[in-house]
Amino acid sequence: MTVLKTTPLHAAHRALNARMVDFGGWDMPVNYGSQIEEHQAVRTDAGMFDVSHMCVVDFTGPRVRAFFEHAIANNVAKLQTPGKALYSCLLNPQGGVIDDLIVYYFTEEFFRVVVNAGTAEKDIAWFNQLNEQGGFGLTIAPRRDFAIVAAQGPNARAKVWDTVPCARAATSELKPFNAAQVAGTPFGDLTVARTGYTGEDGFEIIVPATHVEALWNALAERGVRPCGLGARDTLRLEAGMNLYGQDMDESVSPLDAGLAWTVDLSAPRAFVGRDALEAHGSRAAFVGLILQKENGRAGGVLRAHQKVATPHGEGEITSGTFSPSMQESIAFARVPKDVAIGDTVHVQIRDKQLPARVVKLPFVRNGKVLAA
């Protein structure tokens, strides 16, 4: 029997009677009662997620910037202000996505990366290989002594400040995709980033694992609702945010996964995977779908791996769900390049081919429905 990994908040989840599931080898909460209410809490007020299964990795050394210029597809030349964050893909030489991650710049000798839970060991092995092969001489340190809490929603930042008043000065002026280090709080030294995976404002807080339960409980006392992986998935799907292993993997180019904006080909950098991307270019479109209704009712729910018939050939849904914010069935799909926004395609659901409308992503941002 496989023993599941647990986060430092495992006992807190159990105490809240969370429904736990195996998520990539981790015992994680899928919900604490009502997934819909958790979703709506984030869209209208404030919710929090335990994302401590994700791995913080610290990179130190004089050549850390040069390392990331080579290692990732986005360009760390964009990182000039301490605390600035960059979303990027980590590619293999064939241009496939090893992982998607966030890189934080703090000094010319210290960068921090947050990688996905299921790919952490693979990522770290790849980083070590690139470091050794390139002679960069970096120290690469996974930080399992940290936990991460994501507080998300229109009122999340204010409730974090109510909980950690000493963090307000360092974080009140933070722009999206920036972080600040806040020392000496009642919850230890924190890294507070204005980032998230929900399409709402908020903070992702890197906190010592020894202090995370106290932070979690303090946030809950101030009305930040615990939320599980179920709401996290519907929120990120509405927000048009990819899930690694579902919307892209090592066999998929970022150019075919709606992630061309994370690939910087403008500078003459020899980053891993560049030659393959330039040789193959984009071979598919990555679009949103909304299942059309007949007589006010949808004939099913869009789900991953359903086939999509178009006049230009077949595609496939990569992620799908019922959207609580839109009251519609929505999906991401990889389809032939000639499929255009506004087209009607047909999705195979059980024994029927049901019509769906092609829309531009995202579906929802900051509580507002964008896809009509």
Curated annotation (Swiss-Prot):
GO terms for molecular function: aminomethyltransferase activity; transaminase activity. SUPFAM superfamilies: Aminomethyltransferase beta-barrel domain, Folate-binding domain. It comes from the Bacteria. It catalyses: N(6)-[(R)-S(8)-aminomethyldihydrolipoyl]-L-lysyl-[protein] + (6S)-5,6,7,8-tetrahydrofolate = N(6)-[(R)-dihydrolipoyl]-L-lysyl-[protein] + (6R)-5,10-methylene-5,6,7,8-tetrahydrofolate + NH4(+). One of its GO terms (cellular component) is glycine cleavage complex. GO terms for biological process: glycine decarboxylation via glycine cleavage system. It is an enzyme of class 2 (transferase). Its EC number is 2.1.2.10. It holds the Pfam family GCV_T. InterPro entries: GCS_T (IPR006223), GCS_T_bac (IPR022903), GCST_C (IPR013977), GCV_T_N (IPR006222), GcvT/YgfZ/DmdA (IPR028896), GcvT/YgfZ_C (IPR029043), TrmE/GcvT_dom1 (IPR027266). Keywords: Aminotransferase, Transferase. Belongs to the GcvT family. The glycine cleavage system is composed of four proteins: P, T, L and H. The glycine cleavage system catalyzes the degradation of glycine. This is Aminomethyltransferase.
